[in-house]
């Protein structure tokens, strides 16, 4: 975005941004205040504990183990603006040495009063053994005081550390979980397990707390509106691969340390693999332009409504009203299947395969969490693979790979590495050009017209020059195509000088006959009810709303970055 246009955005959205920011920050600020209060409470408790220890030691009535300082240490994790995503704070554990118990019956009576008949049978069984056991870990202040006031020599306490997740569900798939031994078992917690145990300062991520909150809020809303089984969205800088937001729903509360076996809770950005449909037509056309086989104005004649491909395989046009003569640009705008197949045949298998590999679609991405899927292997010479891949069928990939591919195609043709870790990089010196000059400029112009003239008009948010491509695909279950849909919209903005890629995916959506669509192009046009269960009426609508909300923040907070 040029400096002049950036200033226009700032002027147009300053008041709106301040209002939205204050409104959406309420929940975030409340969480922060609650978290700070909790940490203060813990610190106060530790101080009180030390006073109790002094008194107890003077009386000789309790035994206290040495304080644990580094045993369970893990570094904090913060977002790009210093907000805590994970925090390690002091806590305390209380245990019993059965061999030191003088009056077991009296001790059980006192503990029964404190715990109100809960866990007493477990405590009784443990007391009949000689081995030390923990009565309770991460004891609350009031409970700790009650236990220490018993003055029983068999009861001892030890300082410990507790891992808190103040944002609860917000970053669950990214941060991941730890086990009871304080070892990472998923997400960032696992991938950087050793580093988190050693570094002194916090681990800084590329994520933005406020943007993550807003995107998740909209995904939850549209998931409900279109009765989707799940949803996902990723916002990434197309020039350096920094991920500002990565949301996958449903999610979970990290503080509960639940074992989740439900496949519906997978990370849909990195772990789920999908046939994504017509978003692949962008790759087919970019491949042809990169090979100098076609240009946006190249015209294809005699485009039939269906073509034969191999034995008993027919490829049909999704729209019977599709014109028989289209330019390459029109094929993308109107999302033509047959036109895309004709382009792919001109490119050929080897060249198109190499192109998809170059932009990161065919290989597993080296990423900052372990939950990343490898794309399904493809036999390019079996049946009609080249033809179906041309319009996004017969090939599975992750949302993360899709975001990377769109970034390379639109950022001038430079390779990028998606990342969650904030680094100090000399971006220009490390960028590697992988596409020919001029490819991005031509593609960006066409992607913009998909939004202004084609299937993504609902994402035409004023002031942000959004470009993109829709994709509607039948979901594959046990190698069989079902009636459920995967609706995806890959968008780039601002298209004249691309900075962000936003991919929104809604899984297994349904039409909503009552929903009111409001076009964002300034026309004021409204429409009631979903005409079709396609990406243009589901994921595009969600993406348009997301850009409308986060746009002012991006235009102000990151204008110079």
Which functions belong to the PLM regions below?
Residues 6-7, 13-17, 84-86, 233, ...:
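Beta-lactam-recognizing serine transpeptidase/beta-lactamase-like catalytic domain environment
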């Amino acid at each position: 975005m040029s400096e002049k246009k950036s200033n226009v955005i700032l002027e147009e959205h300053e008041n709106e941004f301040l209002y939205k920011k204050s409104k959406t920050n309420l929940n975030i600020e409340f969480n922060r205040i609650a978290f700070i209060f909790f940490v203060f409470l813990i610190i106060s408790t530790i101080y009180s504990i030390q006073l109790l220890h002094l008194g107890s030691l003077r009386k000789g009535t309790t035994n206290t183990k040495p304080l644990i300082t580094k045993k369970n240490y893990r570094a904090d994790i913060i977002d790009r603006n210093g907000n805590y995503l994970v925090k390690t704070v002091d806590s305390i554990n209380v245990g019993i040495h059965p061999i030191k118990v003088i009056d077991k019956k009296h001790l059980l009576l006192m503990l029964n009063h404190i715990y109100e008949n809960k866990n007493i049978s477990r405590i009784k069984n443990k007391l009949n053994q000689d081995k030390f056991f923990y009565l309770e870990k991460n004891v609350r202040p009031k409970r700790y005081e009650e236990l220490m006031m018993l003055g029983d020599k068999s009861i001892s306490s030890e300082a410990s550390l507790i891992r808190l997740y103040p944002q609860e569900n917000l970053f669950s798939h990214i941060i991941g979980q730890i086990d009871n031994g304080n070892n990472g078992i998923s997400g960032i917690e696992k991938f950087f397990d050793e580093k988190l145990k050693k570094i002194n300062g916090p681990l800084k991520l590329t994520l933005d707390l406020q943007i993550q909150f807003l995107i998740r809020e909209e995904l939850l809303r549209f998931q409900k509106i279109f009765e989707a089984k799940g949803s996902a969205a990723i916002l990434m800088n197309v020039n350096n691969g920094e991920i500002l937001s990565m949301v996958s729903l449903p999610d979970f509360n990290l503080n509960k340390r639940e074992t989740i076996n439900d496949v519906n809770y997978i990370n849909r950005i990195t772990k789920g693999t999908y046939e994504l449909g017509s978003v692949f037509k962008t790759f087919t056309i970019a491949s042809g332009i990169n090979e100098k086989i076609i240009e946006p104005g190249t015209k294809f004649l005699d485009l039939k409504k269906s073509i034969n491909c191999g034995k008993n395989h027919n490829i049909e046009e999704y729209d019977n009203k599709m014109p028989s003569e289209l330019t390459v640009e029109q094929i993308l705008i109107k999302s033509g299947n047959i036109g895309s197949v004709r382009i792919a045949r001109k490119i050929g298998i080897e060249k198109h395969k190499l192109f998809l590999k170059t932009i990161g679609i065919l290989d597993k991405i080296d990423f900052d969490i372990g939950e990343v899927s490898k794309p399904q292997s493809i036999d390019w010479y079996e049946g009609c693979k080249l033809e179906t891949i041309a319009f996004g069928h017969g090939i599975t990939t992750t949302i993360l790979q899709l975001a990377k591919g769109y970034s390379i195609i639109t950022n001038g043709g430079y390779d990028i590495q998606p990342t969650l870790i904030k680094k100090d990089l000399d971006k220009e010196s490390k960028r590697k050009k992988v596409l020919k000059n001029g490819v991005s400029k031509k593609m960006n112009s066409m992607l913009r017209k998909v939004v202004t003239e084609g299937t993504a008009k609902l994402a035409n948010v004023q002031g942000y020059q959004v470009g993109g491509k829709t994709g509607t695909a039948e979901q594959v279950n046990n190698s069989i195509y079902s009636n459920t849909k995967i609706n995806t919209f890959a968008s780039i903005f601002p298209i004249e000088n691309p900075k962000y890629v936003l991919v929104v995916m809604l899984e297994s959506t349904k039409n909503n006959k009552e929903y009111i669509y409001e076009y964002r192009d300034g026309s004021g046009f409204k429409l009631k009810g979903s005409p079709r269960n396609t990406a243009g009426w589901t994921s595009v609508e969600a993406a348009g709303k997301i850009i409308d909300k986060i746009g002012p923040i991006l235009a102000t907070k990151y204008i110079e970055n």
